[in-house]
């Protein structure tokens, strides 16, 4: 990726006020440990990655009161190539339905997560 320091002309002219996507992407996000503990970490009830883990975490962090801040073009990312893994053992529609139900009920603390370990 490209890195533009906040003091650079390119950042000041083009990126500073750019409305970049403010969503959590699993390959490159960070959070405070206490925030992750507060929502009980990743929701292990989904099993394998059926609903994007990052999608589930994003709405749960927001419901808990955390803001999402984009560091696009500011933070470097190195992602190693890998083939996509096909997951046949998961019903994605059922997992999405479960996530939307929990979101509707504002259940941002998952039942099966870090506290079980």
Q: Where is each model-derived feature located?
A:
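Alpha-helix boundary/capping detector
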Residues: 62-68, 87-88, 104
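Active-site donor/metal-binding and catalytic loop motifs
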Residues: 45, 71-88
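Catalytic core of nucleotide-sugar-dependent glycosyltransferases
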Residues: 88-115
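A short, conserved alpha-helix in the catalytic core of glycosyltransferases
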Residues: 23-24, 28-40, 47-67
């Amino acid at each position: 990726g490209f890195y533009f320091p906040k003091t650079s002309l390119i950042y000041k002219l083009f990126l500073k006020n750019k409305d970049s996507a403010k969503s959590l992407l699993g390959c490159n996000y960070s959070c405070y440990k206490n925030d992750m503990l507060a929502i009980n970490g990743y929701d292990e009830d989904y099993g394998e990655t059926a609903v994007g883990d990052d999608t589930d975490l994003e709405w749960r962090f927001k419901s808990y009161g955390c803001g999402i801040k984009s560091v696009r073009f500011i933070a470097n990312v190195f992602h190693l190539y890998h083939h996509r893994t096909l997951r046949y053992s998961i019903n994605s529609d059922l997992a999405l339905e479960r996530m939307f139900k929990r979101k509707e009920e504002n259940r941002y603390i998952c039942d099966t997560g870090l506290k079980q370990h």
